[in-house]
Regions:
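N-terminal secretory signal peptides and thylakoid transit peptides that target proteins
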Residues: 2-23
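C-terminal motif of bacterial Sec signal peptides marking the signal peptidase cleavage site
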Residues: 26-27
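Alpha-helical substrate-recognition element adjacent to the catalytic core
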Residues: 35-211
Length: 211
């Protein structure tokens, strides 16, 4: 079963204003997370929260029960940043944008004296974002536009294969929460369609979500 990506309609106003890309729904391959049948959520601590999830899935998938939900109506929706993967010290798509500014700087010598790019090239993210949504929009437009969707997907894919989180030094695509991957797999195994709601760009997510 596939994951679907939906543009966020709530929170993250700055990023949404700058990075929400066109399209309502984009199918991606399932996230990894196969689990032993003896324990569908092995990374979860034993306790009430884990048991509630298991009880809920059992209740809605047990035909004839009072809480039974037909497979075609089983839908689960998840946030992405901070839920399925980490979001600190800032959204990962913005790390991508920062790296793109550095990669494109040689083609734009004027950026050395133009904000928000001048501050970014000096490593001062706080100063670069002092311009608010307008600054964010300039950064996104400069780093996400002017190419086909296939070209953008290739650039994002190459970045995801090499870029590292500044603290953990792990690839950004490895900064996922295993317990949540287990929930996704558990739900799919019981007939749920899973959806991701994100303030990030669909095309950005499409390039790595199948990993």
């Amino acid at each position: 079963m596939s994951i679907k990506l939906l543009p966020s309609l709530i929170s993250r106003r700055r990023w949404l204003a700058a990075a929400a890309l066109s399209g309502l729904l984009a199918a991606c391959a399932p996230m990894p997370g196969a689990m032993p049948s003896s324990d569908p959520l092995p990374s979860w601590n034993e306790g009430a929260n884990k048991q509630r999830i298991i009880d809920f899935v059992h209740a809605v998938s047990s035909e004839g029960g009072k809480d039974y939900v037909a497979p075609e109506e089983r839908i689960a929706v998840f946030d992405n940043d901070g839920t399925l993967w980490a979001e600190q010290p800032m959204y990962f798509q913005f790390f991508f944008a920062l790296d793109r500014v550095k990669a494109l700087a040689a083609q734009h010598p004027e950026w050395r004296n133009k904000e928000p790019f001048a501050s970014l090239l000096k490593g001062d993210v706080k100063a670069a974002l002092a311009g608010g949504e307008r600054a964010m929009l300039e950064i996104v437009m400069a780093t996400h536009a002017g190419m086909t969707t296939d070209e953008f997907a290739q650039i994002v894919g190459d970045w995801a294969a090499t870029a590292r989180h500044p603290t953990t030094k792990r690839r950004f695509t490895e900064m996922v929460y295993q317990p949540m991957l287990e929930v996704l797999s558990y739900l799919r195994a019981n007939g749920f369609k899973t959806f991701i709601v994100s303030g990030g760009g669909i095309e950005f997510m499409r390039a790595w979500a199948d990993q």
